[in-house]
Amino acid sequence: MKENADRQYRQIVKYTGYFGGVQGLNILAALVRNKVVAVLLGPIGLGLISLYNTAVKLIGDTTNLGIPVSSVRYLSECQEEPDRCRMVATVRLWSLLTAALGAVVCCVLVPFFRLFYFSTEMSFAEFLWLVPVVALTAVTAGELSILKGLQRMREVATQSVVNAMLSLVVTLPLFWLLGNEGILPALVAAAVAASVTVLWFSLRVYPYRLPHSFRHAISAGGGMVRLGVAFVIAGAMGSGVEFAVRAFIANSGTLADVGLYNAGYVVTVTYASIVFMSMETEYFPRLSAVNHDEEACNATVNRQIEVSVLLLAPLLVAFMLLLPFVIHVLYSSMFLPALGMIRFGVVAMLLRAVMLPMEYMSLAKGRPWIYLLTEGVYDIAAVGVVVAGYSLWGIDGAGAGLLVAAVFNCVIDFVACRHYYRYRIAKKSVKMFSVQILPLVASYFVSVFCTGALQWVLGVALFGMSAAISYRVLERESGLMTAIINKFKRKHDEGIDSDSSL
């Protein structure tokens, strides 16, 4: 039992670091692309790219039926090879169907987008460039879900890096040669590159075959679609919350406040995604594979909470202290008024490390309506507290509202998981969170009330404390660093032996 726990710890740390590095490379590639595009195309070009990508995402998210998420759960449950082959074929069929649905919806919505979203100057033929982008995105997402569901994590990470680099290679020349006229061809080229990349890896695992019986495949995918639709609805509710908050700020405040709120939200969520990326990619399939075993399910959730908290806490302490510098790099000094909001958001991210592993339980167990219920209750509360916070204290108050909403979300998720799945949070998980929240909260007060050398001395001390705690616990539980050092020693010794034999 202890050996299995150590192995799980080592696996979580390994893949969190692995996919965190991948996410960091993706963020870096996006920054390079945005910088180059900003120089080549200017604000108008960036605005057009944003509008096109948002349109593609809106259509894709509402027509893919949540297959990219729900299929991971069903693939993870398949233990026998024939079952896996059938499920892979079913997922591919449903991906093609959602690709066709997305393409049709894209064509049907041309008048709507021309009138309300872009401008009447955009021709029907121009908008048709987005049709293959929507369809290829659905196919790509389906193939990627197959790799995730089969827990081919190395392939998932590798294709992500290759795709990020390939996207730069195929799009930047088009921007340079054609300017704004190259935006739509570049989007198609990027979609083709993404599809080719993921198919290169997925077809090596399972050659492309569709089900022999169309009717049976449609029936077999029913549960997958029901779970996926719940995920889509939850995503739509989340988008509705963000829209409602931004609309309230725009109407009761200023557009500048909306910009500050958006910048603060993006900075906080993007940074934390370096750790959270592994949740959907590695943790969700692993949890789905043991969803029928109550004890194993509880242990999996608790270990994920512990590792997420231990890995994220030192990063958040450092981020708290470096926030002014980060804002200057990513934006400009005009966005410094968002500092107060972001600081509250940073604390909320540690709570997110606790609630996300619990939220995946409903999806892993195939209980979509429980997931929808908890998300709906949270969304209503989030709108209320963020709006109230902004009304009382402006942008800083909106950040405080996000923190209160995160606390409420943790409580709701725990109550739901305890009631429906008999989840029991481990004392060790509570202890680790309690120990790591202290330096993070202390770093908040240091960043707000201290300046100059005192701020840096105290900040570095708090970071060192948090990092030391995390390292000690992770090394004790996983022995990962010892294993890495021993591996290098073995390679070094083998190299010496080979040299001596010569």
Locate predicted features.
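N-terminal membrane topogenesis motif
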Residues: 1-30, 85-89, 122-124, 202, ...
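Helix-loop junctions and terminal segments of transmembrane helices
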Residues: 64-79, 149, 207, 264, ...
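Membrane-interface junctions at transmembrane-helix termini in multi-pass inner-membrane proteins
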Residues: 135-159, 346-378, 417-421
